[in-house]
A protein has these predicted regions:
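Acidic, low-complexity/disordered tracts enriched in E/D and polar residues
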Residues: 1-45
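Long, charge-rich, low-complexity alpha-helical segments
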Residues: 33-95
Length: 95
């Protein structure tokens, strides 16, 4: 399980691309694909092997708090849970 201080990176054989047929982003890997919603794509766009989970949540919080509706703690919890789910599938690694 990832924590706020984990520095996630995509597995080297995984990549995010836009699927023209499905009209949405997908996380592709040799054994399959994960369809992404806008939130998942926004999170994975920030996964670069440099930012911590906390950094990613902070950037998203700044983006979404422009509307004043996003709780930073809730965003951190959601980002951590989402990336931990992908880490359990070995699509995300902790540096």
């Amino acid at each position: 399980m990832l924590t706020a201080t984990s520095v996630p990176s995509l597995w080297r054989l995984a990549r995010v691309e836009y699927d023209d047929v499905r009209k949405r982003p997908v996380l592709l890997y040799p054994e399959g694909a994960v369809l992404l919603n806008d939130t998942g794509a926004a999170i994975l766009k920030l996964v670069d092997g440099q930012r911590s989970v906390s950094d990613i949540a902070r950037v998203l919080s700044e983006q979404y708090n422009g509307a004043g509706s996003a709780d930073p703690t809730e965003i951190l919890n959601d980002v951590t849970a989402y990336l931990s789910t992908l880490a359990a599938r070995e699509l995300i690694r902790d540096q």
